[in-house]
Amino acid sequence: MSILDKIVATKQQELAALPVTAVTVDSLRAQVAARGGVRDFMAALAEPRAGDVGLIAEVKKASPSAGIIRPDFDPVQIAQEYETAGASCLSVLTDEQYFQGSPEYLRQIREAVDVPLLRKDFVIDARQIAEAIEWGADAVLLIVAILDDDRLREFHDLAVGAGLSALVEVHDAEELARAKALEAPLIGVNNRDLKTFTVDLDTTGKLAAELDLSQTLLVAESGIHTRADVELLQASGARAILVGESLMRQENIAAKVRELGGQTVHGEGGHE
């Protein structure tokens, strides 16, 4: 059983303990209205606040592949540093067992920053989209590898219908074909194989060649450590990047945000 299979099995157990509730576009829209609306996640990536790439900076304490990434973990402080440094959006891990995330982190960060937020988790049930709104997310991650076509379309329609952005994540050509069938405007290519957790940055370029990039905002995810990595991915067609581990390992998070985002090259930090 792969790590991904284990994570999904755990999610199924967690969801089995929750009350059964119907989730509709109308119920989700009512939730969004009650909390005061949505920050536009996709628009924030298309028009970066700083630098030359839409940067989704991830708040992540641990992962199955890396273990504890940041022992001195203060999610709100990290989120505020990301925002101040110019990140376009934030990704917040809410999975507790495998990534040491928490719904509370998302709630707290919602109150502390003004940029759009992604609930980073393994969505296999419509109730998780309702949770995402309740906890403060403006976008949800839909991982094609763990959803059949019917659920993928259902969850995409629910999220987008409610006004959220849906980041549809793929890793290979077969998954990309399924995402394209949705006409998803926001597609993430995960350079990490979630079955083996190995990373290959060339994955983004290979799959980007199959996309109409005038109709799709492409996000490159995983394995991004240097500005050279970012420029390689931009040349492949990525307009945005999602970065977690390499930011979390920095003593000076803000400087790394500026470096990856291109601010130290094109922006005010030109002499750094």
Task: Give the predicted meaning of each segment.
Residues 2-70:
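An N-cap/entry alpha-helix motif that binds or orients negatively charged groups
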Residues 10, 58-62, 95, 122, ...:
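Active-site beta-loop-alpha junctions enriched in small/polar residues
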Residues 12, 86-87, 137, 184, ...:
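A structural motif
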Residues 53-54, 59, 65-167, 175-178, ...:
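N-terminal active-site wall of soluble small-molecule enzyme domains
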Residues 124-135, 171-182, 220, 224-243:
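Catalytic cores of alpha/beta
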Residues 131-151, 188-197, 238-256:
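Glycine-rich phosphate-binding active-site loops on the catalytic face of alpha/beta enzymes
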Residues 186-243:
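Catalytic-face loop-and-helix region of soluble metabolic enzyme cores
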Residues 206-210, 249-272:
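C-terminal helical cap(s) of enzyme catalytic domains, especially alpha/beta-barrels
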